[in-house]
């Protein structure tokens, strides 16, 4: 329990969440309702700290806390379930539905389709007449379902915690998921047979549904960010969802052309820019944004060089826009860009990657910190993912330079290797790394197995090397190269399966049983009124500060430490991070904050 403030001397403090209070003290929701705060009933009520929740709703926190504690005292001696910091109440959250769906579709259809397509490139297995369609169905399913839906689930859970505001407009949250899901499923089952009238109609419908889902998701992300304090990572997320909508529009146009022509595959000159919009525009930029927000804390990175972030956005978005426009110019007109124009997007994208890496300091060693996470097997996945991103940037430059000096343009296998280095090596590995760190926190559980994290790391990197190497190195027969690609798909399937087992075992683990504690015992555990003054220093742990200084939570949240408003994030980070490190991550003026915190501590 957090310490008390003036006006709340009792078991309920400003740091107690509404959910904790309502679940521990049945009937206490009436107190909230008297202050005009509706919808607080039941254990699924708001998880905001009461002090913060009151201020958001323009209610005087001390008056509310006084009434809440008066209510509790009227129930003295009754057994109450304590919500200890390490034992959050079990709850079912929406985030797990899109994440579970993404994993299910990847294992059931996305990766198996890729394996079948690779085998069909080397052997006569009866798919030759629909080989291109299978390749495109596999790629689209992996991008939109496996990665896209996974990101959607993570985003809807973390955005309110990052920003300290609820998702808005909330009514679009469920529709965005179901529209994207319906669209990608229809695309997968219809495209191989879309040269017939019935499947062609389903293919057209899939593109409309995906556009509607992309618009809904982009609206929620932009709406939520727009209602909160601006932070550096916001621009990356906004750019990402903007490119997502552009990709959905491009997909609709391409599908409409396919249906009107009576075919069932998108020509390569139209498919290449669509994939660039999805992989570089939406997925990579969204991961960049989340990386800015969480990796400094996850990996104890050096302070972010925020002055480089604007150049990153300019370089990366300019490179992507130039690539897409030049490729569309070739696809829809007689214009053929020269070697310089073909090479420029690669150089711009690579420069953006370099600038981002320099800004994030992701290739530098972690800072030494006594508050560092002791279990960081996931860190290898994240570090390796950024090694793969550097490889992608280097490969972009190499292929562009070879073309620029008069060599061959990139072949189908080479561009395929480039995409899979990005999709498997960087994007999928980042999903594994961040999810292994975040999902157990979301569920309030400990990760089932650190050893399975190591197995996942090994499998995904073997899969990426096996998928990229044979496509780049012209050795052996074409059939043997495709056999290697099929093997890579099988190893990638195993990586996702191991990841799924580890996460499912984590989420389904039995939560610690709630402790029963009486009001008398609570009061005995409360700190004495007579205490030595608490001095706040740069090395003070945030968890100690919240426990020892009443009102510190509200002050920190008001200064931009909005993740502390969420109990899950507080439990995960506060006991391990110092004020100095927290101010480096956000950033906040440490000296001014220390002055205000010490003044607050002295006043209590």
PLM region descriptions:
Residues 61-65, 69, 73:
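Short hydrophobic interaction/assembly module
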Residues 72-81, 599-604:
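Long amphipathic N-terminal alpha/beta scaffold segment
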Residues 75-529:
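Hydrophobic alpha-helical transmembrane segments of multi-pass integral membrane proteins
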